[in-house]
Design a protein with these regions (language model features):
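N-terminal "pre-motor" subdomain/linker immediately upstream of P-loop NTPase catalytic cores
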Residues: 1-138, 150, 273, 282-285, ...
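P-loop NTPase catalytic phosphate-binding loop
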Residues: 78-87, 106-223, 231-303, 307-322, ...
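Short, hydrophobic beta-strand segments
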Residues: 1-6, 39-50, 245-248, 376-381, ...
Length: 445
């Protein structure tokens, strides 16, 4: 093994003889067969002597970390090899930037429908995932582990590749912190949802939309969204639902949320609807058995305990991650890979969003907010005279401008959402506007 790896890393931990001696001190004999020096950690492939149990080596992770003066050491078997991987942090870690990943040729491949810039592997190779094949994603990690940055990089990856006509987002952010910066971008199908009760209703609308899409695809004789879009000029957009803090929703409407998510995760893939859920509390009451069963693809950033690691991944190891974007990615094939997620600053995110807002206005689907508000108390309509005057004004406005949407009436007439939605419904009954089509738009008849 080349000693120049140790010189490059300026770290005796990359010296194979040094690590072999530490293991021998604990009664584990074997040889370091290969060293892979990555941007954040160095992978030592250790071949144990005959008769040495893997569990014995894995249990030495804390002792190896102490003897190498490292923050942590992660030990795991390497699939398809007779070696055990010992991952030790580098003295200085390289930054991984989003621009490096999206400029990679793999990102532009046509067969990747919804590309996600996952980051770099231990060896420094850019890794790109496809949300359509996942088809849903569960993310967990403590505060400061890089979870929120990961959500941002996923959103930006998709926005970078697909136009608002090709992909729409529904963003649910009970914390009112991370996703509010995307308010007003043209890719949004409705405003960012910050109320937990309203979020449950919005997920109910997504289930309804999924069923509507299935009926449409059955009528056309196609099996999925790609088959439908290949037949039509007006494409059916993908819908990506992003939930930033799952635990807040589970506290308010746990069973209802779980039922909706179960339906969507089992059936929504063919309809082009995908869910990305994140939580900083990966306990069994948040990540229930039902949710785990339907989210085979998961990402775990640094967690506080082995129990949390087992809850999200089914095995320990996430508690030994280094934070700041260091993660374990579990694919649907149950293979776990360590990846270093790319970083994107708040300033960059805001610049991108400002640019997107300058390009076009969001075209909200009125039915979503109507669906979300239907359980809430409506406005007082006791003053019939005012109601009639307002309705006549709205009809004149719609006929003059040729636009019919709830958000348009809200802006022009300066009225609340409930009233605007009811006026649109009345216009539909009176034959002034058409029913909403599959993308939520209405025509003035």
């Amino acid at each position: 093994i080349k000693k120049n790896i140790a010189e490059k890393n300026n770290n005796k931990n990359s010296d194979p003889e040094f690590l072999e001696k530490i293991l021998l001190d604990f009664g584990v004999e074997g040889k370091i067969k290969k060293i892979s020096n990555g941007p954040v950690v160095t992978l030592n492939e250790f071949e144990p002597a005959p008769g040495i149990k893997v569990s014995k080596i894995i249990n030495l992770s804390e002792d190896i970390a102490r003897n190498t003066s490292s923050e942590s050491a992660r030990i795991a078997t390497i699939p398809g090899k007779n070696t055990v991987g010992i991952e030790i942090p580098n003295l200085s870690r390289e930054n991984v930037f989003l621009s490096e990943i999206i400029s990679d040729e793999k990102f532009s491949k046509k067969d990747i429908k919804l590309p996600i810039a996952l980051g770099k592997s231990i060896s420094g190779t850019p890794l790109i995932g496809d949300l359509t094949s996942m088809p849903h994603l569960l993310i967990a990690g403590t505060t400061g582990s890089g979870k929120s940055v990961c959500i941002n990089t996923i959103i930006l990856s998709i926005i970078y590749k697909l136009s608002p006509e090709q992909c729409k987002f529904i963003m649910i952010d009970p914390k009112m912190l991370e996703l509010s910066t995307y308010e007003g971008i043209p890719h949004l199908i409705c405003p960012v949802i910050t109320e937990a009760k309203k979020a449950a209703s919005v997920l109910g609308w997504v289930v309804k939309e999924m069923e509507s899409r299935y009926k449409l695809m059955t009528k056309e004789g196609v099996r999925n969204i790609d088959g439908y879009n290949s037949k039509h000029k007006l494409v059916m957009p993908y819908i990506v639902v992003v939930v930033d803090e799952m635990s807040d929703l589970m506290l308010v409407a746990g069973k209802e949320i779980e039922n909706y998510i179960q339906k969507l995760s089992q059936m929504a893939r063919a309809a082009g609807i995908h869910i990305i859920m994140a939580t900083q509390r990966p306990s069994v009451d948040v990540i229930t058995g039902t949710i785990k069963a339907n989210f085979p693809t998961r990402i775990s950033f640094q967690v506080t305990s082995k129990i949390d690691s087992r809850t999200i991944l089914g095995e320990q190891g996430a508690e030994q991650l280094l934070g700041k974007g260091d993660m374990l990615f579990m694919s649907s094939a149950n293979r776990i890979v360590r990846i270093h997620a790319p970083y994107v600053s708040e300033n960059e995110i805001e610049k991108i969003n400002s640019f997107l807002r300058s390009q076009a206005e969001p075209d909200y689907v009125d039915e979503i907010l109507n669906f979300a508000d239907e359980k809430e108390t409506g406005e007082n309509y006791s003053d019939n005279e005012n109601k009639d005057q307002l309705y006549q004004s709205a009809v004149e406005l719609v006929k003059t401008d040729g636009k019919a949407s709830t958000s348009y009436l809200q802006r022009k007439l300066q009225i609340g959402y409930n009233r605007a939605a009811r006026i649109i419904d009345m216009m539909e009954e009176d034959g002034i506007v058409s029913k909403a089509n599959h993308v939520g738009k209405r025509e003035v008849l």
